[in-house]
């Protein structure tokens, strides 16, 4: 049974999509192994987004991710990583297909604004292990 890390980002929490996102996970047959409400800080975001810290948009990303609470979860199931990523949709909301979480609910960014794409999911088993350790063994 595969596990992955996922997060409902501040825009998803603020806009009231927690129940919808969790319902989609449960309807797909995945198990929720852990769930917490957190307020992210710059330190944890630097570890989570380590490959992005030198990018010019990183401060905007930190501002967005610290703008409100996030919901962090560990979910499990058969092929959960690839299936969850498909369910989320394309990272850029304008490219996300209808029927995906981002396609149905995310908003394309304005200039100088972070991409408010509602959810995050690990992209590989290695990323899942690393992100679970960062957020739950903090």
From Swiss-Prot:
Protein location: Cytoplasm
UniProt key word Ribonucleoprotein: no
Signal peptide segment: none
Swiss-Prot/TrEMBL GO biological process terms: CTP biosynthetic process; GTP biosynthetic process; UTP biosynthetic process
Single GO molecular function: ATP binding
Cofactors: Mg(2+)
Ligand binding (ATP): 9, 57, 85, 91, 102, 112
Protein function: Major role in the synthesis of nucleoside triphosphates other than ATP. The ATP gamma phosphate is transferred to the NDP beta phosphate via a ping-pong mechanism, using a phosphorylated active-site intermediate.
UniProt-recorded name of the protein: Nucleoside diphosphate kinase
Organism: Streptococcus agalactiae serotype III (strain NEM316)
């Amino acid at each position: 049974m595969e596990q992955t890390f996922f997060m409902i980002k501040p825009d998803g929490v603020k806009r009231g999509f927690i129940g919808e996102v969790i319902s989609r996970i449960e309807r797909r047959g995945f198990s929720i192994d852990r769930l917490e409400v957190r307020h992210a800080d710059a330190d944890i975001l630097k570890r989570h987004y380590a490959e992005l810290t030198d990018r010019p948009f990183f401060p905007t990303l930190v501002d967005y991710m610290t703008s409100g609470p996030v919901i962090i979860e560990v979910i499990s199931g058969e092929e959960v990583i690839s299936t969850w990523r498909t369910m989320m949709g394309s990272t850029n909301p304008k490219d996300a297909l209808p029927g995906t979480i981002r396609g149905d609910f995310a908003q394309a960014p304005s200039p100088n604004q972070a991409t408010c794409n509602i959810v995050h999911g690990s992209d590989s088993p290695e990323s899942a292990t690393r992100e679970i350790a960062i957020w739950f063994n903090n």
